[in-house]
């Protein structure tokens, strides 16, 4: 190091020598007047001039001076300084070059030779000093790229799937992802949608527009039977309806499109979710009752098994099963069950106890009744009556008492596209009824030998989906694809309880997440795992700078990145198949949606059809009258059932004691 320093000092001395020679030769007359010329030097310089022409131009000696100055600066190591910047270096260097090289004309000014020489030497010296400062600063410049990537984007970018992998079930989404300082085109290939999919994201993150809509369209194109829960009806329903009209060729048997909509009976089909033909056991009645009551009382989800939770569920289940066995299930509808529940409990218990299969089922109520524990009994009954009374609505009764279609949507002989619409303003009422449709559909479609089908639930926490965890776990073998959309895991835990929420989170194979924050972002970051990342550190002391590079396992997609995703940007992971391996399952990309194409398609959309025309032959709208008449008919039928059953029991010698006990 000392030897190198001596060489650099020597080069700098040579550089200064060339500057002095330049002044000596081109300012000779003035220096002679000052008495600072030497004959020996004169001879040496004249010999150089004759042999090399070194002084034929004022620039040659300057160029040699600058070359040796540059070499001396390159080999010099200075103490690194953060405050030195390229801007300062460039300014100093530019000033030096101008003063050093562009001052020859000062020797020709119409001034005394002494003045010309002083100006020339001053500018030459100032220029040289500026260039020397620039060179010194270059050696002291702190050269590092530590702050070039302050958000660690390069370390956290990775190669993603660029192949399009299609099969008869797949959902394929085009993407753009950042890797190695450029944007690349890629694909998210959901080659096995039957392993269930989750779409997470805060409101406005693009989960419906980028993912849910694409699922609906592509699965209709590939001939799936479809069940869609449309929380903001008719957003998803119109997409499904219009896409079906344009892609009927994807089905071997032309599917029918059905709508359940409580807000507008004109645009709704009628369907009885507890149709007697699909209820083979009292357990089916219990499932229906369970779904209804937990949708009406979300706080009960975390209290399952408690006495005052199970009691109203069992009571409603007994009433549903009674309607199933009474006259072959002729009156087995949910509105009939509500009306029967609201009759005098003495009559209801008397009727239900007259059926052996219900006697043991109702024993807790009967025991309380016979022991005259009226407060307990009334509390049990009120727990069922009060929430169910919110569902007494002529429009709801109308929709739930018809039989326009059955809920086996993936029947190969009669495939269906079914959309059910909710209303955010009436969510608490409608969700209970729609939850009943959900639970029945899950039971009916999750069977072998059926058509491939899809269950799409957007805004999942707005409805309690009984049996969802079991559907996810078993649907793969029955070709049922499940897509669930919601905002984050905490929302799911709040509405489904911790245990069921954890099961749903951990059994889903395909995950899409837009912007989410908090615990959800941390859970997802852990799911995506860690990757080997480069770490660079720098140490600066008075003598030198040292840089060290190390590697460390760190989060591939940190929670902070997930919390700040732009609209349309998604992170996630997909599941693959034995014969369709996807090595890089994780993605962090923008899902590309052709906005212009979507606008053109939307502009051509037709409105959902009117299902029922309530106009009479005179052109008058009779909807309210017909719906009210249906409501009144149901109430009258239930009154008649009670009267007929009480009469039957009174006239039956084996059952009449039930009446007598009550009368006493």
Which residues does each PLM region occupy?
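P-loop NTPase motor domains
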Residues: 22, 32, 36, 142-147, ...
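Hydrophobic alpha-helical segments involved in membrane association or supramolecular assembly
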Residues: 69-76, 435, 439, 510, ...
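Active-site-adjacent beta-strand anchor residues
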Residues: 8, 229-230, 514
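Low-complexity, polar-biased intrinsically disordered regions enriched in Pro/Ser/Thr/Gly
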Residues: 177-183, 297-307, 535-552
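Basic- and hydrophobic-enriched, low-structure N-terminal and domain-boundary segments
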Residues: 1-205, 209, 214, 541-542, ...
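N-terminal charged/capping segments associated with class I S-adenosyl-L-methionine
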Residues: 586-589
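Conserved ATP-driven motor cores of ASCE-family P-loop NTPases powering translocation/secretion/packaging/pilus
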Residues: 472-474, 478-575
């Amino acid at each position: 190091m000392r030897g190198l320093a001596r060489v650099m000092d020597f080069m700098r001395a040579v550089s200064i020598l060339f500057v002095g020679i330049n002044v000596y030769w081109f300012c000779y007359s003035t220096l002679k007047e000052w008495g600072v010329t030497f004959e020996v030097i004169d001879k040496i310089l004249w010999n150089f001039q004759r042999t090399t022409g070194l002084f034929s131009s004022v620039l040659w000696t300057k160029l040699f001076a600058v070359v040796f100055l540059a070499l001396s600066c390159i080999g010099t190591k200075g103490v690194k300084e953060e405050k030195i910047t390229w801007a300062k270096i460039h300014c100093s260097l530019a000033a030096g070059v101008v003063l050093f090289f562009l001052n020859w004309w000062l020797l020709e000014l119409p001034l005394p030779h002494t003045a010309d020489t002083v100006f020339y030497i001053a500018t030459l010296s100032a220029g040289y000093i500026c260039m020397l400062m620039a060179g010194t600063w270059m050696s002291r410049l702190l050269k590092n790229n530590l702050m070039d990537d302050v958000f660690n984007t390069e370390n956290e970018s990775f190669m993603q799937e660029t192949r399009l992998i299609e099969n008869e079930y797949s959902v394929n989404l085009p993407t753009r992802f950042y890797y190695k300082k450029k944007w690349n085109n890629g694909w998210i290939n959901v080659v096995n949608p039957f392993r269930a999919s989750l779409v997470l994201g805060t409101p406005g993150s693009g989960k419906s527009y980028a993912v849910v809509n694409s699922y609906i369209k592509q699965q209709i194109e590939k001939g799936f039977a479809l069940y869609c829960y449309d929380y903001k009806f008719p957003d998803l329903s119109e997409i499904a309806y219009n896409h079906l009209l344009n892609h009927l060729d994807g089905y071997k048997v032309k599917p029918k499109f059905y709508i359940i909509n409580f807000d507008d009976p004109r645009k709704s089909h009628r369907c009885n979710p507890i149709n007697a033909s699909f209820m083979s056991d009292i357990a089916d009645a219990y499932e229906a009752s369970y779904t209804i009551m937990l949708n009406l009382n979300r706080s009960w989800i975390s209290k399952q098994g408690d006495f005052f939770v199970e009691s109203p569920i069992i009571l409603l289940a007994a009433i549903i099963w009674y309607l199933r066995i009474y006259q072959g299930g002729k009156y087995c509808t949910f509105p009939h069950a509500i009306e029967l529940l609201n009759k005098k409990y003495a009559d209801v218990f008397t009727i239900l106890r007259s059926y052996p299969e219900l006697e043991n089922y109702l024993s807790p109520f009967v025991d309380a009744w016979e022991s005259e524990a009226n407060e307990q009994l009334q509390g049990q009954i009120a727990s069922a009556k009060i929430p169910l009374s919110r569902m007494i609505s002529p429009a709801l009764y109308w929709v739930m008492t018809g039989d326009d279609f059955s809920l086996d949507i993936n029947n190969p002989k009669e495939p269906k596209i079914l959309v059910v619409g909710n209303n955010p303003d009436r969510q608490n009422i409608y969700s209970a009824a729609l939850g009943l449709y959900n639970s029945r559909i899950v039971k009916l479609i999750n069977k072998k030998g059926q058509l491939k089908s899809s269950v799409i639930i957007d805004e999942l926490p707005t409805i309690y989906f009984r049996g969802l965890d079991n559907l996810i776990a078993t649907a793969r073998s029955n070709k049922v694809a499940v897509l669930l959309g919601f905002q984050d895991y905490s929302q799911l835990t709040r509405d489904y309880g911790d245990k069921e929420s954890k099961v749903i989170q951990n059994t889903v194979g395909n995950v899409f997440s837009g912007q989410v924050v908090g615990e959800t972002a941390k859970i997802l970051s852990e799911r995506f795992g860690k990757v080997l990342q480069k770490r660079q550190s720098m140490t600066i002391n008075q003598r030198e700078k040292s840089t060290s590079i190390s590697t460390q396992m760190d989060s591939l997609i940190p929670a902070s990145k997930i919390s700040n995703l732009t609209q349309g940007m998604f992170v996630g992971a997909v599941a693959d198949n034995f014969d369709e391996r996807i090595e890089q399952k994780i993605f962090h990309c923008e899902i590309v949606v052709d906005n212009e194409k979507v606008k053109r398609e939307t502009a051509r959309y037709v409105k959902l059809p009117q299902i029922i025309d309530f106009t009479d032959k005179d052109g008058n709208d009779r909807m309210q009258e017909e719906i009210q008449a249906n409501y009144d008919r149901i109430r009258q039928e239930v009154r008649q059932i009670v009267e007929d059953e009480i009469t039957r029991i009174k006239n039956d010698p084996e059952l009449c004691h039930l009446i007598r006990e009550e009368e006493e």
